[in-house]
Amino acid sequence: MLTSELGCCYISNTVSSLNLLAEKECSQVRSTVYELKELWLKRNPDIPFYTLGAASYLDAAIEPQDYYSKALLYNPILCDRLGWLYERLADRLAQLLKARTSYHQNYALPGFHVYLACKLFEQPIASIHCDSQYKLINWESGDRTDFNNPISFTLAISLPKFGGGLNTWNLHHQEIANISRSEFVQLVKSRTKTYYPYQIGELILHSGHTVHQIAPAKNIQPDDERITLQGHALFSQGSWQIYW
């Protein structure tokens, strides 16, 4: 853990983890996600990839107001059905980061990625990127918000039979800020890639400014699925504001 100019602890460029849910609790969350299946949004016409909840990197990128409208729709439902999960997440992050945590009423609660069985997921089709979706959101007190030390996290709820995980590269967003796509591809090839396997109920945290990718799956089975809780946090106005 390191300390920023605003005096808060933050996640360094390495990947951290903490046990958040028991396997039985993950099964409970999975059941709730399926009970809300009518609210899933299909995010790609060609593959079975869905979200449950408003996702800033998708919704605010198209039309910012659409993101806030979706958050207004989904937040009460997710809070009602999974309030205990959000309370535990905030409490454990507060312990880890040694600071207050909060959920802003205008921002989306952490939501879910849902990937159903598809052989295409064995290929490296997920983007290699840094998380900069916070730029799409209106932070009410920009001068009291630490944009240099964001946090991204994933909580595995259900995984394919042969597992799932995260690829990261020893590459920071400052190194890729002003380069072309072809230069970025070559730079990624020149850096070390590290694979972090997910475990059911384990929260994986990293700086969103570290270059990363959803790792390709292995030997997808017909009944496989990959369900994860996704979210981010920025230190703003004296607390870590958790959102998606």
Locate each region found by the language model:
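Short, Φ-rich (hydrophobic/aromatic) sequence segments
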Residues: 30-33, 153-156, 227-237
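Catalytic core of Fe(II)/2-oxoglutarate
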Residues: 177-244
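Residue-level detector of short, conserved catalytic/binding motifs and their immediate flanks
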Residues: 110, 149-151, 155, 202, ...
